[in-house]
Amino acid sequence: VTHADWLLVSGERGNPSTRLDGRRPDGEAWSRGNDARPLVHGAVYFAELLAGISAMRAGDLLLFTDWRGDPDERLGGPGTEIGAVLGRAAERGVVVKGLLWRSHLDSIHFSQEENRHLGEEIAEAGGECLLDMRVRPGGSHHQKMVVLRHRGRPERDVAYVGGIDLCRNRNDDATHRGDRQSLPLASAYGPHPPWHDVQLALRGPAVGDVEAVFRERWQDPSPLSRSPLTRLRSLVHRDDTDADTLPPQTADPEPCGTHTVQVLRTYPNRLLRGYPFAPDGERSIARGYHKALRRARSLVYLEDQYLWSPRVVDCFAEALRRHPRLRLIAVIPAIPEQAGWLTLPMNLIGRIKALEELRRAGGDRVATYGLENHAGTPVYVHAKVCVIDDVWASVGSDNINIRSWTHDSELGCVVYDESPDPRRPQDPGGLGDGARVFARDLRLELMREHLDAGGGPGEPAPDGLCDPAAAFEAFAQAAAALDAWHGGGRPGPRPPGRLRRYVAPDLPTLQQVLAAPLSHILVDPDGRPMGMRRRNTF
């Protein structure tokens, strides 16, 4: 078994214009010797990020991209608002550079004004934050990364990649009582929506790869927007629309761990003129999934915000059809974030069809769950995690839908651990790959939380959760017990666990007819060239 069995070699990325795969003398499209740590929950990530930024000195470099940034979101207690933390860093002489998505109108629940205010706060302190609308019509920059580089102290360098924005709702912890600084979701989530999310902390040479992703976007000479109205508004507001020159990229940090990391992305086939670093777009996230799923034999464990679109899940369905031992667990939001008469079916119709496709392929080997906290409030699942056969693990900004795989900018990292896991079963896939410590520990940490099974990273796991078949059954039993307790009027103590069996609601025919075309156009659009769409290739 080699890395090339699981990871994309440079020619398989499908984008010869990027600098990513040519950064190393050996020509490998991944970096070895990293230390990758999953930071489960926004509170864990924010606490570490606050400590890291606070320790930065003059001459250090802080780079970030975000979908939404709220300047008043606290990383910790009072005085730790993200705008203030970044501003103080810039005032100390840290070089602070950011790219925020310049959104569509706030009236349709996007984030233009908050992004503008965060950018202004950083600029006033001496940093630079650009509002970047270089996307397809209706698209967004969805990448979420922070890179901290330290002049003369490369052992402190770290990059964060995953699903957590620097904004409201994200600062939740394992109790899932929600962020006190909240934005409204569907009413079922209450005034402080519980929020489940994951970010990856990377140390080692992969930090240089993540920085290179930022630099490609920052150095794009294209205007930040093609819209004459947007450019006029920027002129009126005196927005910074010209990226200053970045200091030269320093050498990658030295190897410090056992994790091989591959950086994968989505960029759309941008109309008229593409990105200089991806003229025809890049769909390496989709390609990475397709390659890894060809080796799936035992268990695919997913946590995802959406899980939409038969055009995306067909590669999962094909794996289920080919291999009768393969099981799939998906943890998703029980209720979409918007619950209007038309927005609800627009968000549901793609998921309903995707789950139908998966169940046709895998039958009762496919199980889908929502989460609730101990008060019975649904937990909004915003994590984007996939673990295959305890070997291949992915954490990123990308969801399982056609938008994330083709239309918006996305950033994810695949981790392949060089350390085999000694716990049984040692080779759940049966192909000689052997379970890997990182992938298995990530799956177990997430499953333990959802089962209220205790334990933590690095602690001995219950044997039943290491075994994919037993873990599949443990989820089913926990959800059945909690469903029965709710269905019976909640008699006696609440059963352990947070899992509820997901059952897709029935949509009236009229809603389906109206929602289907709007879903394809507005909610889950396709950013591929027409030939790829017809062949459903990536």
Mark where each language-model region is.
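Charged, low-complexity intrinsically disordered terminal segments
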Residues: 2-538
